[in-house]
Regions:
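A glycine/serine/threonine-rich, flexible loop-to-helix segment
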Residues: 55, 162, 184, 196-219, ...
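Conserved SDR Rossmann-fold cofactor-binding beta-strand/turn motif
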Residues: 188-198, 238, 251-253
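Conserved mid-core segment of classical short-chain dehydrogenase/reductases
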Residues: 58, 69-78, 82-87, 96-119, ...
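Short C-terminal tail/terminal secondary-structure segment
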Residues: 235, 246-260
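Catalytic loop of short-chain dehydrogenase/reductase
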Residues: 19-28, 99-134, 143-171, 175-184, ...
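A conserved structural motif in NAD(P)-dependent oxidoreductases
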Residues: 219-230, 241
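Short, small/polar-rich loop/turn modules that mediate ligand/substrate recognition or access, typified
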Residues: 183, 188, 245-247
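Canonical Rossmann dinucleotide-binding motif of NAD(H)/NADP(H)-dependent dehydrogenases/reductases
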Residues: 7-43
Length: 260
């Protein structure tokens, strides 16, 4: 009997990676894994300040397109997908790895959060996934995969995480809704939930070093996960072998979340 198992290779597939800031970014670990698996990539950078940090990384993975995209700028977002359609005529997978909350709303109590801060955190951290998915789906003509990044703070009250926990909870709900709506087009939608990783975004969380120490102490594997491990998981979920998984939040945190 011959078994035709789905392939884990990304050879011949085209992917868009959103969220690289530097070599410590989770999105960078994912981009490296996508490239190693054979994908051709388009990579975005936030603004001119970020460009000199991101462009060398894009070149390192032979990105076909390196484009500016601030998700608060609808014209820039539309331009990215227009460039992808013009260059490739299709898109096979999308990685959304961005989040933001004003520091006072991140560090402060939720009950004290500002309306503007809450709205901006939700817009950048959650609704941007919806907007990108709306533009990506028509290009996924043969099906595809959409991935985003969450955190355990979506489900538990994490110290110094403020309204970001609410935004991540909404992001996970959006993941489920999008998976149901896009499933008929053979598009999977999943969130990956890594444990604490020392990224630039994480550096904005107060007492993050203590959070990492606690994670290492309590996780069954007694270590943190790496961006390379998160990237390997993302590559699996983006590949044909991972397309049977959808609407899920896949945790990769050295087992920390199972320990009370």
């Amino acid at each position: 009997m011959t078994h035709n198992a789905p392939r884990t290779s990304l050879k011949g597939l085209k992917g868009l990676v959103v969220g690289i800031a530097n070599v410590h970014s989770i999105a960078w670990g994912c981009a490296e894994a996508f490239k190693a698996a054979g994908a051709e990539l388009a990579i975005t950078y936030l603004n001119e300040k970020a460009k000199p940090h991101v462009r060398p990384l894009a070149e390192a993975v032979d990105a076909t397109l390196t484009l500016p995209m601030d998700v608060e700028n609808d014209a820039e977002v539309a331009a990215v997908f227009e460039e992808i359609e013009a260059k490739w005529g299709k898109l096979d997978f999308l990685l959304h790895s961005i989040a933001f909350a004003p520091l006072q709303d991140l560090h402060g109590r939720v009950v004290d959060s500002s309306r503007d801060g809450f709205n901006r955190a939700m817009d950048i951290s959650c609704h941007s996934l919806i907007r990108l998915s709306r533009l990506a789906a028509p290009l996924m003509k043969d099906g595809g995969a959409i991935l985003t990044m969450s955190y355990e703070g979506a489900n538990r009250v994490a110290p110094n995480y403020g309204i970001m926990g609410l935004a991540k909870a909404a992001l996970e709900a959006a993941t489920r809704a999008l998976s149901a709506e896009l499933g008929p087009a053979n598009i999977s939608v999943n969130a990956i939930s890594p444990g604490p990783i020392a990224t630039r975004a994480a550096s904005g969380i107060l007492e993050f070093d203590q959070l990492m120490e606690d994670s290492v102490k309590n996780a069954p594997l007694h270590r943190m996960v790496t961006i390379e491990e998160v990237g390997a998981l993302a590559a699996l979920l983006a590949s044909p072998a991972g397309r049977g998984i959808t609407g899920d939040v896949v945790v990769i945190d050295a087992g920390r979340h199972i320990v009370y």
